[in-house]
């Protein structure tokens, strides 16, 4: 179903039916940031709910686990690990935002929560619901070939999809506009004047994304991964976002001793500073891995923004899915084409999903929503289809490419990893 079509309401009615049959439910969400909102929504209608995710302390996990084992719980809500909850008599398993790659654990023990869910649904002879506005190519193919049953919700509850604009930043640079296009700048001002709220997505955390020497071309890279380190101003550290290698920022080039290094690129930390500086009415809050490390941080940011203590929410992809704020009328996407540069055959699919999902945060109430997507490659099919909310068109285009290049779902890929000490 499209974003805002009422999938959560459908989930709750299905759970209600299951509970009346004296059975139980597991509900998976892709991000810890989504659990507080979903649990709060569920608590308006149900009791005996357990919450499981990696943000809980060991003691809290143990307490929830014991409640489930002792038959004190009817509904388990959580991130991917919640699929292992020792719940008996399961009547339904629901995976929200089923397309999300976070359901797959890439480190030991390796598992895909969707595969485990399929196994548990078969074991308990219960339905498995895979919900998404942008299903994975593999899931949609299974639905098209009758392996899964396809149920579609094609309209928003308020029949009010946001108006989406694409902005070519190559043209904006020629006009002297850099970080924000004139359109996005004007729309932010308009929103703040109306006392409405704004979400800005920049899928890169940190302050500067590259520290380089203009004299000799040296770039400060991770010694393990050989990719540029990202500067984090708050801690004054250079961090690798792949292996978490950390070091303090250098003041001189190790190659030529030049002490005038260039800080290039922008992450969410720098964007928050910039937005607060150029918009006098802006009260900006940031949601990314760096601001949500502490206990209950997701919930606090969510509640503060919902209570309108802030009018601009800046974040990475964790703000793209599932969040529902009635006063948000504008979503701005900076570097909307950045994920197309990732060397992965799914980069087009991931780009489409991210843009479609974050666009769905705008105009979810009676207020009209707008979306501005900025990028240097906005004529790419995945961006155009996302701006038109055209999943089927994207799917057909993507399948042509996958078939020609022998990619899934037509062929299986095998990863062989070799390592030694």
Features from the language model and the residues they span:
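Short, intrinsically disordered, charge-balanced linker/junction segments flanking boundaries
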Residues: 419-421
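Inter-lobe coupling/hinge segments of SF2-like helicase ATPases
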Residues: 1-417
């Amino acid at each position: 179903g499209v974003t805002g079509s009422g999938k959560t309401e459908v989930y709750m009615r299905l759970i209600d039916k299951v509970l009346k049959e004296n059975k139980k439910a597991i509900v998976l969400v892709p991000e810890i940031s989504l659990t507080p909102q979903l649990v709060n929504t569920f608590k308006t209608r149900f009791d005996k709910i357990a919450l499981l995710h990696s943000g809980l302390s060991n003691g809290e996990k143990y307490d929830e686990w014991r409640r489930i084992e002792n038959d004190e719980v009817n509904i388990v809500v959580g991130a991917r690990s919640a699929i292992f909850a020792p719940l008996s008599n399961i009547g339904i398993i629901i995976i929200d935002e089923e397309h999300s790659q976070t359901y797959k654990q890439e480190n030991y023990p390796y598992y895909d929560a969707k595969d485990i869910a399929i196994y548990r649904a078969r074991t308990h002879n219960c339905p498995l619901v895979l919900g998404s506005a942008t299903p994975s190519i593999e899931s949609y193919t299974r639905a098209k070939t009758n392996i899964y049953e396809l149920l579609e919700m094609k309209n928003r509850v308020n029949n009010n999809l946001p108006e989406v604009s694409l902005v070519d930043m190559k043209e904006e640079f020629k006009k002297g506009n850099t970080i924000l296009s004139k359109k996005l700048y004007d729309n932010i001002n308009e929103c703040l004047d109306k006392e409405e709220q704004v979400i800005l997505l920049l899928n890169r955390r940190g302050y500067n994304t590259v520290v380089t020497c203009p004299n000799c071309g040296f770039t400060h890279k991770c010694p393990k991964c050989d990719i540029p380190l990202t500067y984090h101003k708050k801690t004054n550290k250079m961090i690798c976002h792949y292996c978490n290698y950390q070091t303090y920022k250098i003041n001189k080039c190790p190659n030529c001793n030049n002490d005038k290094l260039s800080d290039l690129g922008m992450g969410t930390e720098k964007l928050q500073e910039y937005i607060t500086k150029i918009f006098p009415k802006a009260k900006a809050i940031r949601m990314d891995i760096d601001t949500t490390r502490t206990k209950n941080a997701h919930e606090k940011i969510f509640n503060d923004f919902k209570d309108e203590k802030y009018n601009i929410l800046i974040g990475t992809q964790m703000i793209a899915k599932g969040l529902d704020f009635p006063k948000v009328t504008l979503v701005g996407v900076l570097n909307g084409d950045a994920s197309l540069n990732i060397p992965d055959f799914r980069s087009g699919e991931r780009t489409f999903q991210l843009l479609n999902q974050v666009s769905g945060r705008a105009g979810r109430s009676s207020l009209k929503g707008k979306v501005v997507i900025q990028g240097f490659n906005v004529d790419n099919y995945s961006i155009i289809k996302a701006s038109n909310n055209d999943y089927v068109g994207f799917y057909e285009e993507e399948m042509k490419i996958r078939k020609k290049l022998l990619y899934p779902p037509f062929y299986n890929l095998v990863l062989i990893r070799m390592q030694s000490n």
